């Protein structure tokens, strides 16, 4: 796990490698409120929750860049376990969400389909505590891939683009 602070921007972050593919799941939090979001919880939820606890932050939502198994395999379970809303990806990734259980079986990842509380589009914003991140729709890797950009820190959570 690695932690990064963006001075004077109100945002801190940590990367937690998850799944057999060692995908980078991110935890971002507002330093004013200690409210946090987990981005792309592909699996290994106990590791993710351990990092959340270690940093003394409170998860308020799940953000999803795209619905490939290594990025979204743990979304349904985490949302259910902690009663968290799911934001993202773009609706064009519905096909991948519908197939996530089948995809997971190929990698030994138990996954379930999920329904986002909020689909995201290219000009939306999301909040983490008092921090606002812009959303950009970046189709290519998947048709519904989105990225999250925090302008004050110049940090971008880009999934696989």
Regions found by a protein language model. Give the residues of each.
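Metallo-beta-lactamase
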Residues: 102-103, 115, 125, 131-161
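Short Pro/Gly-enriched beta-strand edge/turn motifs at strand-loop
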Residues: 7-12, 104-108, 129-131
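Conserved beta-strand hairpin/beta-sheet module of binuclear metal-dependent hydrolase folds
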Residues: 3-55, 147-161
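Short catalytic-loop micro-motif centered on adjacent basic/acidic residues
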Residues: 35-39, 61-64, 135-137
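Short Gly/Pro-enriched turn/cap motifs at secondary-structure boundaries
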Residues: 16-18, 109-110, 115-117, 137-139
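Divalent metal-coordination and catalytic microenvironments
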Residues: 28, 40, 66, 78, ...
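Residues that act as N-cap/strand-start positions at coil-to-secondary-structure junctions
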Residues: 10, 22, 112-114, 120, ...
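Active-site HxH/HxHxD metal-binding segment of metal-dependent hydrolases
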Residues: 43-127
């Amino acid at each position: 796990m690695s932690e990064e602070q963006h001075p004077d921007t109100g945002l801190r972050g940590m990367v937690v490698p998850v799944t057999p593919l060692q995908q980078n799941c991110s935890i971002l939090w507002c330093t004013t409120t200690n409210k946090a979001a987990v981005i792309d919880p592909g699996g290994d939820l106990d590791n993710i929750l351990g990092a959340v606890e270690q940093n003394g932050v409170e998860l308020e939502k799940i953000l999803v860049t795209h619905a490939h198994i290594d990025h979204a395999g743990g979304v349904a379970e985490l949302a259910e376990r902690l009663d968290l809303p799911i934001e993202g990806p773009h609706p064009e990734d519905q096909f991948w969400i519908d197939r996530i259980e089948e995809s997971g079986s190929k990698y030994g990842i138990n996954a379930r389909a999920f329904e986002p509380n909020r689909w995201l589009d290219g000009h939306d914003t999301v909040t983490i505590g008092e921090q606002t991140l812009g959303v950009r729709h970046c189709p290519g890797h998947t048709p519904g891939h989105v990225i999250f950009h925090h302008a004050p820190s110049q940090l971008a959570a880009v999934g696989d683009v």
